[in-house]
């Protein structure tokens, strides 16, 4: 079981949700990865917290450009993740 979310993680997840609901529908689907960068960001923040989760999210967004092939890029297992990948 993952630890409770910090206020910082909650705030960043809320910002990503605003993007998903208000901005992303206007831009249309253009993410090169599965899961999408915004879904990846939420999962990374939940698994790793605000510092490492933010770092993983920024790295992922920087890879999302036309010169990168994209594809399947899941969030790495977290310290409390007991599922096998």
Curated annotation (Swiss-Prot):
Entry keyword set: Cell inner membrane, Cell membrane, Membrane
Subcellular location: Cell inner membrane
Coiled-coil regions listed in the entry: none
GO CC annotation terms, alphabetical: plasma membrane
Bilayer topology: Peripheral membrane protein
Tree of life domain: Bacteria
SMART domains (UniProt xref): Haemolytic (SM01234)
InterPro entries referenced in this protein's UniProt entry, alphabetically: Membr_insert_effic_factor_YidD
Main localisation: membrane
Entry keyword annotation includes Membrane: yes
Pfam families hit by this protein: YidD
UniProt similarity note: Belongs to the UPF0161 family.
Entries under NCBIfam families matching the protein: membrane protein insertion efficiency factor YidD
Entry function: Could be involved in insertion of integral membrane proteins into the membrane.
Stated name of the protein: Putative membrane protein insertion efficiency factor
Organism from which the protein derives: Escherichia coli O6:H1 (strain CFT073 / ATCC 700928 / UPEC)
């Amino acid at each position: 079981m993952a630890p409770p979310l910090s206020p910082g993680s909650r705030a960043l997840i809320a910002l990503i949700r605003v993007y998903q609901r208000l901005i992303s529908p206007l831009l249309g689907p253009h993410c090169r990865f599965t899961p999408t960068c915004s879904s990846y960001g939420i999962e990374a923040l939940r698994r790793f917290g605000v510092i490492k989760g933010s770092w993983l999210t920024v790295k992922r967004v920087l890879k999302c450009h036309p010169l990168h092939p994209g594809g399947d890029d899941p969030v790495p297992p977290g310290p409390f993740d007991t599922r096998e990948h």
